[in-house]
Amino acid sequence: MGEASSPAIAKDVTELIGNTPLVYLNKVTDGCVGRVAAKLESMEPCSSVKDRIGYSMITDAEEKGFIVPGKSVLIEPTSGNTGIGLAFMAAAKGYRLVLTMPASMSMERRIILKAFGAELILTDPLLGMKGAVQKAEELAAKTPNSYILQQFENAANPKIHYETTGPEIWKGTGGKIDGLVSGIGTGGTITGTGKYLQEQNPNIKLYGVEPTESAILNGGKPGPHKIQGIGAGFIPGVLDVDIIDETIQVSSDESIEMAKSLALKEGLLVGISSGAAAAAAIKVAQRPENAGKLFVVVFPSFGERYLSSVLFHSIKKEAESMVVE
């Protein structure tokens, strides 16, 4: 992963994962006293941070002898991006992959998963990720040679962020980072990346991000929201809650508006959870005590995956009603 076998040509698609760029946010940060740089996980080979764990969970299971290409059936509940991270890996390695996903996730996700040859089963959106997890467990019980990768419980998830994302951010900022801002889905990114960064400098602050509508880490109740990929409605096993200094709440509407602003003002087309993370990072960077500090925010996915979602609803209608001039 990330270390090409020849100076210029990668051995296969797995060597393209990681080493994503960092870029300053310049206009949406008006009024901030701290600086904000985005880690563009939207520039992974399959356009999301989940490419890292798709690689790590499959590789880890192979090394432990739990799965064998051509024989094992991989099963996983997903909100979409982990499914895509697993699907391109499964295609490259020759695995049958069965995914369960809430029906509320974007149409692009369904199409991309099928394009990679994954089998997809939709679950009741009202049951959220819990419903997808239950369905995956049912399928595994009746499918021979099946293996659930369990992104919410799998130690290979935070481990890859500890080994790659954390060091990349530390190196990319020259060790000058003061805080990390990351949305919490499985919790793998903030747990692994955060652990590495705090080992380098214990003063680095870790800020989680969750939907206002499902603010369970702040003691609220799980509820429906529009920020695909974060706010699973339960506390995942891989999330180390003790490592987090503060979990910031951002509403679905705030997240959508910020994602739109990032495209219009920064030239960055990103998903709704990136909007949530950016909105949280800006709140932190506006605090007087953070003057001159550098915050890195993780942008988990590319905006094109959300064309059918509420993020682009008004633009889609406008585009569909256009006429030849």
Swiss-Prot record:
EC identifiers of the protein: 2.5.1.47
Co-factor(s): pyridoxal 5'-phosphate
Keywords, sorted A to Z: Amino-acid biosynthesis, Cysteine biosynthesis, Cytoplasm, Pyridoxal phosphate, Transferase
Protein origin, superkingdom: Eukaryota
Family matches, as Gene3D superfamilies: 3.40.50.1100
Record-stated family: Belongs to the cysteine synthase/cystathionine beta-synthase family.
Self-association and partners: Homodimer.
Protein name as it appears in the record: Cysteine synthase
UniProt gene name: CYS1
